[in-house]
Design a protein with these regions (language model features):
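Surface-exposed flexible segments
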Residues: 42-57, 226-227
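Extracytoplasmic/secreted envelope proteins and their assembly/folding machinery
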Residues: 49-52, 56, 120, 124-127, ...
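Short loop/turn microsegments at loop-to-beta-strand junctions
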Residues: 68-69
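Structured segments of extracytoplasmic/periplasmic soluble domains
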Residues: 54-65, 126-134, 174, 191, ...
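Short, solvent-exposed alpha-helical surface patches in non-cytosolic proteins
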Residues: 180-227
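A general structural signal for well-ordered secondary-structure junctions
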Residues: 65, 149, 198-199
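Basic/polar, cationic surfaces and motifs that engage anionic cell-wall
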Residues: 1-38, 42-43, 76-91, 95-187
Length: 227
């Protein structure tokens, strides 16, 4: 983890702890998916926080915003940076649809750049964490691509199989749903392990050899009052 002012650069595990610990956030009902276009991959040189500062400078000076527009940015190396606080709506890009909407700017030009596997994993993980935190059900009504509401290609034609609603339903949204399911299972596994006194690794091993084990563990954890 690295912090300069409000900008906090984290890996996925650090991000999970950060988001789960947030208090006093406003209510959010949707998450916007954007690419930066500029900066693109060619502009990323181990300078992630500096890129955040440069984006904020552009948003304030050129777009007349009060601060950086996005709540989060993801980077090719898989790190995620906090920008605008979650006590505020996202800024600028899709006004008036910014109301109760989280803005994610993913660094890259995904009309051209081929997204790294690390960034893919972080984008899916971040969206799943936010859906879990704010009780958002992943769908094309809640995970919104910029191109669906304005005449732009953003978040890019190479974004998770394409930037259409059909592509989102086929490629992106199932990944977010699977990530949410995996999070619920991991939480349930810890609850059942704690309550049963049986080693966590034993339950994980059974998951790999028994069909429908995930659903069973989640049901048991709910009976214990968890998940």
């Amino acid at each position: 983890m690295k912090q300069e002012g409000k900008f906090i650069l984290m890996n996925r595990e650090e991000l999970k702890v950060y988001i789960e610990g947030l208090k006093g956030c406003k209510t959010f009902t949707s998450i916007q998916q954007h690419h930066t276009a500029s900066p693109a991959y060619k502009d990323v040189k181990n300078n992630n926080i500096q890129l955040m500062k440069s984006m904020e400078n552009y948003h304030v000076k050129n777009l007349k915003m009060s601060e950086i527009a996005q709540h989060f940015s993801t980077f090719p190396d898989g790190t995620i940076c906090v920008g605008r606080p979650l006590t505020k709506d996202g800024g600028g890009f899709l006004s008036p649809l910014n109301k109760n909407s989280i803005t994610i700017e993913n660094v890259g030009n995904f009309d051209i750049d081929l997204m790294t596997e690390e960034q893919k994993q972080s984008i899916v993980f971040l969206n799943a964490l936010l859906c879990k935190k704010f009780n958002i059900i992943p769908s094309t009504s809640t995970l919104i691509y910029h191109t669906w509401v304005q005449n732009k290609s953003c978040p890019g034609t190479k974004w998770f199989g394409g930037n259409t609603k059909a592509a989102a339903e086929k490629y992106f949204i199932p990944l977010v749903k699977q990530s949410l399911e995996d999070m619920s299972f991991e939480e349930a596994l810890k609850i059942v392990s704690d309550k049963s006194g049986v080693n966590y690794d034993y339950w994980k091993l059974r998951k790999d050899i028994e069909p429908n084990f995930k659903g069973l563990i989640i049901k048991i954890a709910k009976a214990f009052g968890g998940v």
